[in-house]
From Swiss-Prot:
Protein name, UniProt field: Protein abrupt
An annotated GO BP: muscle attachment
Species this chain originates from: Drosophila melanogaster
Gene expressing this chain: ab
Ranges of biased composition (kind: Acidic residues): 671-682
Compositionally biased tracts (Polar residues): 1-15, 239-253, 452-461, 876-886
InterPro entries: BTB/POZ_dom, Dros_DevTransReg, SKP1/BTB/POZ_sf, Znf_C2H2_type
């Protein structure tokens, strides 16, 4: 240790206690090493020997004396004191904040953010301490709404430095924010801590000493002040002790002790009375306790302080009595309930605090008749362990007392209100987070307190309330009228009263949404809110019409899909796996999910048109999915690019061109048929099908296009399928037979067969009309197998384009070169034992008549003899199954779905 250290030796009777202190000049740091401690011990031993005046030589000490000396060394303690410890620690925290080292919390407000340390915020504010303990995050972000960034910056400077300079205009806002955030030194937050009782006891003890010993000093201050004035000053000192900030309280305590220790000189008594009068003025002119420069004390100022305290007492008593009378309770009960409750006056942020009006013209009588003793003040402090919320007013305290709401419960289960937020804004946030029961409890107290306070004033107009409620409904409007006030009433108590009076109907609107607030329906806004909510629910489920074509859709999502598919000019998108072109992104997704099941398409690239089909890329993507197809095979299977005679045409080109040029019976283009019937989300389909407004040609076109859906889409709803079949055949909707359900005999086999027709139409040389007719006859065969007599149809009932005999005669590939069309809804004998006989016809030949089992077996042998090869699904049996979910590559190439997929 390089610095000189002064050793002060103080020996007691039993053992010497050495106190080692640094010299009076403040040093930056003190470090004690092992060598320095040993040197100090040796010096101490020599100093101790010299101090005791021992004449023994250190070289030859007696054994007994040496032993006792060692015991004394073991019993000695060293007091190492760092004089500038507090300043060094505080400067270290300031340096850490300036360098942003080890910061672990962020305060965000007004588009700015400030970093700080949790330990500093927790030490300076019980609010932040509870908040950070309740949210144990590594680096939380605290969002302070409706708080100015200048106030937060000044508060952080105050917490790290202990002082801050604030302009006079910003002082009310700054003090209000400090009060809401419970910053120590700027707000009275000591009520809930253990040392508050000791502090109150010390203040009462010092004040009693001042009462007994300050008569001469008070006489020197003013000859007009008698013993009653001294007692009044002592009483005022007790009254304002609970309103003083920690700095003021400690200052008053220190001044009182100094006056007692220095023979109660007049100068110290002046400073003590100075503090009392300054604190009293501070408590009268501002709702917050803040350190202020005390004004010079004169006899008139002391008398004015006593008169002001008396007038404040009278004002509180009169206001409490008036509020109790308006609430329906007796004045005596109100006085007993509010005697221990101090008035809490709140001012909005303004440039200057307004003076308190004195309703009592004779303050001396009020002073003599209304005194706050120490017991009442102690009871008041016990009942207010936490600082009041933003808009907690005297009538809210009365409501709490009348309804038995305990403040201790608020302390234990308190939720943290957002700093600087208006109570009606907190009303909305409380409705949004209705699970926070204590926030709702605090909100109920605040709103009902405002209602009780405004009940003595002018009665609101019910029509005016209803008009404001129409614009205040927060459940149905995103742009709500602001009820924070426009600043026109800032700075005066009259302005606050007017603002609360105007916002009273709006405040009551929020009471309806809080559960448990009122015992029954309030009647103010319940009918309107329920009716408005019902209307909103109806509107939320209303169908949405298309602005282009007038079709009605169930949701906004289906309407957007329809607009993109039908009414948006898009070049189209090409399937990267098979080259099929879809006219919209939704159609491409539909094609992927139907034609490439089992292959994850979320990572596949989207190729907008014009984009060429890349077989190599498709082969690599299929290989990743476990499907091995060579690029050459994919190139050979790729569909031609339309009917312009491009390369890769051939027989496949003819079928593709036939599909693209397919038109309906009415001669309209294919897109018209798609627009009229292919949208499953269109709610106007039923009206168009069975309504009275459609023409016969439109109805016929709808029936025919619906029948064509049998050829390229499997209908899972069997009742809808039979109804569509009956409509196509001109029969009534109710066929008079029992519709087959999904558990009918052979239903799964029939579904598989219909899907096979769908996916292999062009591979078998069939047109779309032929596939639709085959699907229709298969459905009729299933009905016949179930015992329904639908096999004998009247002549001319079936449309000509669906007559299989005419179709076979007009298509040589279908009639002669190809095998006979046999539709066999094969069923297990155990399933159809009750409805099927061995000789019952089950199938249709190409001529349209029913075939027996012998003919079916013969045709089956003919098909085998002609060597009809099965379709290659191209998936290496990875996805084959009983339901044949995946089609072959030819069907993928030439797939045309109802949502606009086509080939180029």
């Amino acid at each position: 240790m390089t610095e000189s250290t002064q050793l002060q030796t103080a020996e007691n009777n039993n053992a010497g206690v050495v106190k080692m202190e640094p010299p009076p000049p403040a040093t930056s740091s003190v470090s004690v090493s092992a060598a320095a401690a040993a040197h100090a011990l040796s010096s101490l031993s020599s100093l101790t020997m010299a101090a005791t005046g021992s004449a023994l030589s250190p070289a030859t000490p007696p054994p007994s004396l040496n032993l006792s000396h060692q015991q004394q060394q073991h019993q000695q303690h060293y007091a190492l004191k760092w004089n500038d410890f507090q300043s060094s620690i505080l400067s270290s925290f300031r340096h850490l904040r300036d360098e942003e080292d080890f910061v672990d919390v962020t305060l965000a407000c007004d588009e700015r953010s400030f970093t700080a340390h949790k330990v500093v915020l927790s030490a300076c504010s019980p609010y932040f301490r509870r908040l950070l303990k309740a949210n144990p995050c590594e680096h939380p972000i605290v969002i302070l709404r409706d708080v100015r960034c200048d106030d937060v910056e000044n508060l952080l400077s105050f917490m790290y430095n202990g002082e801050v300079n604030v302009s006079h205009e910003q002082l009310p806002d700054f003090l209000k924010t400090a009060h809401l955030l419970q910053i120590r030194g700027l707000a009275d937050v000591n009520g809930g801590y253990p040392y508050s009782k000791a502090l109150s006891a010390a203040l009462s003890h010092n004040s009693s000493n001042n009462n007994n010993n300050n008569s001469s000093s008070n006489n020197s201050l003013s000859n007009n002040n008698n013993n009653n004035n001294n007692n009044a000053e002592s009483s005022n000192h007790n009254k304002i002790s609970s309103y003083l900030s920690p700095n003021q309280t400690s200052a008053a305590c220190n001044n009182s002790s100094n006056s007692n220790s220095n023979n109660h000189s007049s100068s110290h008594n002046n400073s003590s009375s100075n503090n009392i009068s300054g604190s009293l003025n501070s408590s009268l002119n501002s709702p917050f306790s803040a350190p202020q420069i005390p004004p010079p004390v004169t006899a008139s100022s002391a008398a004015a302080a006593a008169a002001a305290a008396a007038s404040l007492t009278a004002a509180v008593a009169a206001a409490a009595a008036a509020t109790a009378a308006s609430a329906g309770s007796s004045s005596s009960a109100a006085s007993g309930q509010t005697s221990g409750t101090p008035a809490i006056q709140e001012l909005k942020a303004s440039s200057a605090a307004s003076p308190v009006r004195n309703p009592n013209p004779n303050p001396s009588k009020a002073s003599s008749s209304n005194h706050w003793d120490m017991g009442e003040m102690e009871g008041s402090r016990k009942s207010h362990l936490t600082p009041p919320p933003q808009k907690r007013i005297k009538s809210a305290d009365l409501f709490r007392a009348q309804h038995g709401i305990s403040p201790e419960r608020l302390l234990l289960d308190r939720e943290f209100p957002v700093a600087g937020q208006h109570p009606l804004t907190r009303n909305r946030s409380g409705r949004d987070t209705s699970k926070d029961r204590e926030r709702n409890l605090e909100l109920r107290e605040s709103l009902l307190g405002q209602a009780l306070e405004n009940s003595n004033g002018q009665q609101a107009n019910p029509k005016h309330e209803l008009g404001q409620s129409a614009g205040e409904d927060s459940n149905s409007s995103d742009t709500e009228p602001s009820d924070r006030g426009d600043g026109q009433h800032d700075g005066t108590l009259d302005g606050i009263d007017n603002q609360r009076s105007h916002s009273f109907p709006n405040a009551f609107l929020g009471l309806q949404g809080i559960p448990g607030l009122l015992p029954g329906p309030s009647g103010i806004n319940s009918d309107f809110v329920s009716r408005r909510s019902l209307e909103m629910r109806v509107r939320a489920t209303d169908p949405r019409p298309c602005p282009k074509c007038g079709k009605i859709y169930r949701s906004a999502h289906t309407l957007r899909t329809h607009l993109e598919d039908k009414h948006t000019v898009c070049p189209g998108y090409r399937c990267v796996l098979c080259g099929t072109v879809a006219k919209s992104r939704n159609s491409l997704h539909s094609h992927m999910s139907r034609q490439h099941r089992g292959i994850s398409t979320k990572d596949l690239p989207v190729l907008p048109m014009p984009s060429a089909f890349d077989p190599e890329l498709a082969s690599r993507l299929l290989a990743k999915a476990g499907v091995k197809i060579s690029p050459a095979e994919l190139r050979a299977r790729a569909s031609p690019t339309g009917g312009s005679g491009s390369s890769g045409g051939g027989g496949g080109g003819g079928s593709s061109q036939a599909k693209l040029d397919l038109s309906n019976a009415s001669g309209g283009p294919m897109d018209d048929a798609e627009d009229s019937d292919d949208d499953p989300e269109d709610l106007t389909t039923g009206n168009g099908l069975y309504g009275m407004g459609g023409s016969s040609s439109d109805l016929s076109r709808y029936h025919e296009s619906l029948l064509s859906n049998f050829g390229h889409a499997r209908m899972r709803n069997e009742a809808a399928a039979v109804a569509a079949t009956a409509a196509a055949l001109g029969q009534p909707k109710d066929l008079g037979v029992q519709l087959p359900n999904s558990n009918a005999p052979g239903q799964s086999l029939l579904d598989t067969y219909l899907q096979f027709i769908t996916e292999n139409t062009f591979g078998m040389g069939m047109s779309q009309e032929q596939a639709a007719a085959a699907a229709l006859r298969a459905k009729m065969a299933q009905l016949n197998a179930m015992g329904h007599s639908l096999d004998n149809l009247p002549p001319g009932l079936l449309p000509g384009q669906f007559d299989l005999s005419k179709l076979a005669a007009g298509n040589p590939a279908f009639g002669q070169s190809g095998p006979g069309l046999t539709i066999e809804p094969i069923m297990r004998h155990e399933q159809a034992a009750g409805n099927l006989s061995p000789n019952r016809p089950l199938a249709l030949n190409s001529g349209g008549r029913m075939m027996g089992h012998d003919e079916m077996a013969e045709n089956d042998g003919d098909m085998r003899r002609e060597g009809s090869e099965p379709m290659d699904l191209g998936l290496d049996n990875n996805q084959s199954g009983s339901n044949h979910e995946v089609a072959n590559s030819d069907a993928e190439e030439n797939y045309s779905e109802d949502e606009g997929v086509h080939n180029t």
